[in-house]
C-alpha cells in the first residue's frame, strides 16, 4: 500500500493495482491508459503514450534508449528478467493499443495550437498553427500582407480596410473542415482587423 517509487502519470488504487493516464497537452483532457499489475508496467505505458504524443523529446519515466532493457531511471536493473522479456514482446501490441486510444480521444480534426502571429521578416500578419505529435509541423493558415505605413492609411474607414483585407488573404482549406475553417477565417480576419485598427 505504501508507494516506494513515484512515476510520472502513474498512481496506485486503494486495493493495490496501478493505473496510468496521460494528459493531452492541446486538448486539455486526460487519456486513460489502463490498469497494470506493477508501477513499472504503468510507467512504461505512460512513456510509450508520451513518445507517441510528443515525440522523442517527451518527458518519460525511463530513458528512451533503455526503455526495454530493464533499467529504471535510477540506473538499477529489475530483478525479474522474465518480466522485461514479456514487456518487450508486448510493447508492439501496447503501442498499437495506445495509438488507438489516442486516435479515439482525438476524433476532432488534428489537435493544434492556433495563434495570431506577426512575421516581421516578410511583413505578414496572420493565423499560425502548430500541430501536436511526433510528426508535428507548423504552418501559416492565413496571412495578410501589411503595406507600408502612411498617414492616409491610418485614417481609412473600416469598410475600406475590409476591401483591402479581402483580396490579400491566403487560406488553406482541407476537405471536410471547410465549414469550421470558414468560421475560423472570419474570427481570424476580425482579430487582424482589430489589431490593424489599434495601431
UniProtKB/Swiss-Prot annotation:
- Where does this one sit in the cell? Nucleus
Q: Which gene encodes it?
A: WIN1
Task: Name the residue ranges with Low complexity bias.
Answer: 79-91
Pfam families from the UniProt entry: AP2 (PF00847)
**Family recorded in the similarity comment:** Belongs to the AP2/ERF transcription factor family. ERF subfamily.
Instruction: Describe its function.
Output: Promotes cuticle formation by inducing the expression of enzymes involved in wax biosynthesis. Confers drought resistance. Acts as a transcriptional activator. Binds to the GCC-box pathogenesis-related promoter element. May be involved in the regulation of gene expression by stress factors and by components of stress signal transduction pathways.
Primary subcellular site in the record, as a coarse category:
nucleus
Q: Which organism does this record belong to?
A: Arabidopsis thaliana
User: What does the record say about tissue specificity?
Assistant: Expressed in aerial organs, mostly in flowers, and in roots. Also observed at the branch points of pedicels of most young flowers, and in a patchy pattern in roots of mature plants and very young leaves in the rosette, including support cells of their trichomes.
Q: Which GO terms describe its biological process?
A: cutin biosynthetic process; ethylene-activated signaling pathway; response to water deprivation; wax metabolic process
- Which keywords does this Swiss-Prot/TrEMBL entry list? Activator, DNA-binding, Ethylene signaling pathway, Nucleus, Transcription, Transcription regulation
| Cell division found in the keyword field | no
This chain's protein is named: Ethylene-responsive transcription factor WIN1
Disulphide bonds annotated for this chain are none
Tell me the first and last residues of the signal peptide: none
User: Which residues does the annotated region (Disordered) include?
Assistant: 60-91
| Molecular function (Gene Ontology), one example | sequence-specific DNA binding
Do you know which InterPro entries this protein is assigned to? AP2/ERF_dom (IPR001471), AP2/ERF_dom_sf (IPR036955), AP2/ERF_ERF_subfamily (IPR050913), DNA-bd_dom_sf (IPR016177)
Q: Which sections of the sequence are annotated for DNA binding?
A: 6-63
- PANTHER family, per this entry? ETHYLENE-RESPONSIVE TRANSCRIPTION FACTOR WIN1, SHN SHINE , DNA BINDING / TRANSCRIPTION FACTOR
Q: Polar residues composition bias: which ranges?
A: 60-72
Q: Which Gene3D superfamilies match?
A: AP2/ERF domain
GO cellular component, alphabetical, reads:
nucleus
Amino acid at each position: 500500500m505504501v508507494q516506494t517509487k513515484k512515476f510520472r502519470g502513474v498512481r496506485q488504487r486503494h486495493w493495490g493495482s496501478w493505473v496510468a493516464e496521460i494528459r493531452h497537452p492541446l486538448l486539455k483532457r486526460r487519456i486513460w491508459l489502463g490498469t497494470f499489475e506493477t508501477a513499472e508496467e504503468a510507467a512504461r505505458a505512460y512513456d510509450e503514450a508520451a513518445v507517441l504524443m510528443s515525440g522523442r523529446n517527451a518527458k518519460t519515466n525511463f530513458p528512451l534508449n533503455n526503455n526495454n532493457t530493464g533499467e529504471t531511471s535510477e540506473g538499477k536493473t529489475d530483478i525479474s528478467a522474465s518480466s522485461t522479456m514479456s514487456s518487450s514482446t508486448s510493447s508492439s501490441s501496447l503501442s498499437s493499443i495506445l495509438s488507438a486510444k489516442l486516435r479515439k480521444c482525438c476524433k476532432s480534426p488534428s489537435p493544434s495550437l492556433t495563434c495570431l502571429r506577426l512575421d516581421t521578416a516578410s511583413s505578414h500578419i496572420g493565423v499560425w498553427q502548430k500541430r501536436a505529435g511526433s510528426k508535428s509541423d507548423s504552418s501559416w493558415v492565413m496571412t495578410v500582407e501589411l503595406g507600408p505605413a502612411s498617414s492616409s492609411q491610418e485614417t481609412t474607414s473600416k469598410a475600406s480596410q475590409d476591401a483591402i483585407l479581402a483580396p490579400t488573404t491566403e487560406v488553406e482549406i482541407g476537405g471536410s473542415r471547410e465549414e469550421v475553417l470558414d468560421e475560423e477565417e472570419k474570427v481570424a480576419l476580425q482579430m487582424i482587423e482589430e489589431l490593424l485598427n489599434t495601431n
